[in-house]
């Protein structure tokens, strides 16, 4: 199957953001945000490196591995579990076919463990059941799984209710965040092989998959999701964990900060209204190219109306762009961590000269929070200001909010990747440590 015939990434211009007028007055108007064509081969060299290593392995002394079944590429399922959403679909497609909230509902009245078969976890559309009062629970904290039982419930719902498939008939590729505990991979294997009885599985780093969606083999992945942000240098397919940057603020912190700003202006939002605030953030907010100049614009030019679910209208003003300043000045949300642009430059400065030059032109933006209007433009401006003697280049894809899943779809569809599946019989014979021979 040729992925070139299915889809190809598009190029965005630096002036597409909401601060276009301001950007036209700067020298930045000559810069463009670039992407690579998938025709260049989606991370071919990185995949071939792993394929060569896999072929050089000592043959496992097992009759099973000699005659392990060949998997149909179209049957592979790709799952990207994020703090905000869980995305899944069949490998080979350009975007996930199913996307549900990772937040689940638990009844306030806990069910007894003595034969009570009442439902304990409500997922996806089940959350809208008006007859049951639910407390909302998220099984992830800053991108790391803290409740595996709930993750199992989410996947059960995805496989059985959303995709309507039998997981025992499909190989599954799972994404794993940077700097996650090694035990994560063993828990994924245990759940997929022992609970869902999948025939084969593979685990890949999220940042590497994001890079594959750009058709690159090297790059600096700047990922801003819902619960955590990362800056990950990758060279020839290999992430560099020693200089990877992690920031514990992301989209959920932006939502809370926006709520505080609106309440300071006389609104009355609480945690029960976070879904409404999320919608306001998505539809009304943007990132200012120059917040100081933006503040000089008459407030009436920023003012827009938003209709609440009950039909009432509220007016929004400067909080539309002030909320996003937390990414560049985390002290606004009482965080002592570096700003996103500062962390990006810090990671670049830790690289040797040749690698830094390569990564400087391959800054790859990913994650749902980067979809805010003006985000790429502002990051480009901040990086150019901090690196006047270099030429940093921010690259964007139109659907970078699903970049991790798309990269997994590409990877699982490559013919050269097929020997890297870990099969259930291999897992049963050699144990969880066999994962590290194929997933690295």
Swiss-Prot record:
<dbReference type="InterPro" id="IPR043129">
    <property type="entry name" value="ATPase_NBD"/>
</dbReference>
<keyword id="KW-0539">Nucleus</keyword>
<keyword id="KW-0206">Cytoskeleton</keyword>
<dbReference type="InterPro" id="IPR031769">
    <property type="entry name" value="ACTL7A_N"/>
</dbReference>
<keyword id="KW-0333">Golgi apparatus</keyword>
<dbReference type="GO" id="GO:0031514">
    <property type="term" value="C:motile cilium"/>
</dbReference>
<comment type="similarity">
    <text>Belongs to the actin family.</text>
</comment>
<dbReference type="Pfam" id="PF16840">
    <property type="entry name" value="ACTL7A_N"/>
</dbReference>
<dbReference type="GO" id="GO:0001673">
    <property type="term" value="C:male germ cell nucleus"/>
</dbReference>
<dbReference type="GO" id="GO:0005634">
    <property type="term" value="C:nucleus"/>
</dbReference>
<dbReference type="GO" id="GO:0005794">
    <property type="term" value="C:Golgi apparatus"/>
</dbReference>
<dbReference type="GO" id="GO:0009566">
    <property type="term" value="P:fertilization"/>
</dbReference>
<dbReference type="InterPro" id="IPR004000">
    <property type="entry name" value="Actin"/>
</dbReference>
<comment type="subunit">
    <text>Interacts (via N-terminus) with TES (via LIM domain 2). Heterodimer with TES; the heterodimer interacts with ENAH to form a heterotrimer. Interacts with ACTL9. Interacts with CYLC1; the interaction may be relevant for proper acrosome attachment to the nuclear envelope.</text>
</comment>
<keyword id="KW-0221">Differentiation</keyword>
<dbReference type="GO" id="GO:0001669">
    <property type="term" value="C:acrosomal vesicle"/>
</dbReference>
<keyword id="KW-0744">Spermatogenesis</keyword>
<dbReference type="Pfam" id="PF00022">
    <property type="entry name" value="Actin"/>
</dbReference>
<dbReference type="GO" id="GO:0032991">
    <property type="term" value="C:protein-containing complex"/>
</dbReference>
<protein>
    <recommendedName>
        <fullName>Actin-like protein 7A</fullName>
    </recommendedName>
</protein>
<dbReference type="GO" id="GO:0001675">
    <property type="term" value="P:acrosome assembly"/>
</dbReference>
<keyword id="KW-0963">Cytoplasm</keyword>
<dbReference type="GO" id="GO:0005737">
    <property type="term" value="C:cytoplasm"/>
</dbReference>
<comment type="function">
    <text>Essential for normal spermatogenesis and male fertility. Required for normal sperm head morphology, acroplaxome formation, acrosome attachment, and acrosome granule stability. May anchor and stabilize acrosomal adherence to the acroplaxome at least in part by facilitating the presence of F-actin in the subacrosomal space. May play an important role in formation and fusion of Golgi-derived vesicles during acrosome biogenesis.</text>
</comment>
<feature type="region of interest" description="Disordered">
    <location>
        <begin position="1"/>
        <end position="27"/>
    </location>
</feature>
<dbReference type="GO" id="GO:0005856">
    <property type="term" value="C:cytoskeleton"/>
</dbReference>
<keyword id="KW-0278">Fertilization</keyword>
<dbReference type="GO" id="GO:0007286">
    <property type="term" value="P:spermatid development"/>
</dbReference>
<feature type="region of interest" description="Required for interaction with TES">
    <location>
        <begin position="36"/>
        <end position="56"/>
    </location>
</feature>
<dbReference type="GO" id="GO:0007338">
    <property type="term" value="P:single fertilization"/>
</dbReference>
């Amino acid at each position: 199957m040729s992925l070139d015939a299915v889809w190809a990434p598009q190029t965005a211009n630096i002036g597409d953001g909401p601060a276009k007028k301001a950007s036209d007055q700067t020298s930045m108007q000559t810069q463009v945000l670039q992407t690579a064509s998938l025709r260049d081969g989606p991370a071919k060299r990185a995949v071939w490196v792993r394929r060569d290593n896999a072929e050089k392995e000592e043959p496992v002394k097992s009759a099973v591995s000699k005659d392990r079944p060949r998997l149909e590429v179209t049957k592979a399922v790709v799952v990207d579990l994020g703090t905000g959403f869980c995305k899944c679909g069949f490998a080979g497609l350009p975007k996930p076919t199913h996307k549900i909230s990772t937040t689940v509902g638990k009844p306030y009245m806990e069910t007894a463990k003595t034969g009570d078969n009442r439902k304990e976890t409500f997922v996806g559309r089940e959350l809208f059941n008006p007859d049951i009062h639910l407390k909302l629970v998220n099984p992830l904290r800053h991108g790391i799984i803290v409740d595996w039982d709930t993750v199992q419930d989410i996947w059960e719902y995805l496989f059985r209710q959303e995709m309507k498939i039998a997981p025992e008939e499909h190989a599954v590729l799972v994404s794993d965040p940077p700097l996650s505990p090694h035990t994560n991979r063993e828990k994924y294997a245990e759940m997929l092989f022992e609970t869902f009885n999948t025939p084969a599985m593979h685990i890949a780093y999220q940042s590497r998959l994001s890079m594959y969606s750009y058709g690159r083999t090297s790059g600096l992945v700047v990922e801003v999701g819902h619960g955590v942000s990362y800056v990950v240098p990758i060279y020839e397919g290999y992430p560099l964990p020693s200089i990877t940057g992690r920031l514990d603020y992301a989209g959920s912190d932006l939502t809370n900060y926006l709520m505080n700003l609106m309440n300071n202006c006389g609104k009355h939002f609480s945690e029960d209204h976070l879904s409404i605030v999320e919608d306001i953030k998505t539809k009304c907010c943007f990132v200012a190219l120059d917040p100081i100049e933006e503040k000089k614009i008459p407030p009436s030019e920023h003012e827009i109306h938003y209709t609440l679910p009950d039909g009432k209208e509220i007016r929004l003003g400067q909080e539309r762009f002030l909320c996003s300043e937390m990414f560049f000045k985390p002290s606004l949300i009482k965080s002592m961590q570096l700003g996103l642009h500062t962390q990006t430059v810090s990671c670049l400065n830790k690289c040797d000269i040749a690698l830094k030059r390569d990564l400087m032109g391959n800054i790859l933006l990913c994650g749902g929070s980067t979809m805010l209007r003006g985000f790429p433009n502002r990051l480009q401006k901040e990086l150019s200001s901090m690196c006047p003697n270099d030429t940093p280049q921010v690259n964007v894809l139109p659907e970078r909010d699903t970049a991790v899943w798309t990269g997994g779809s590409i990877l699982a569809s490559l013919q050269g990747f097929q020997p890297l599946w870990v099969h259930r019989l291999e897992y049963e014979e050699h144990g969880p440590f066999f994962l590290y021979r194929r997933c690295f």
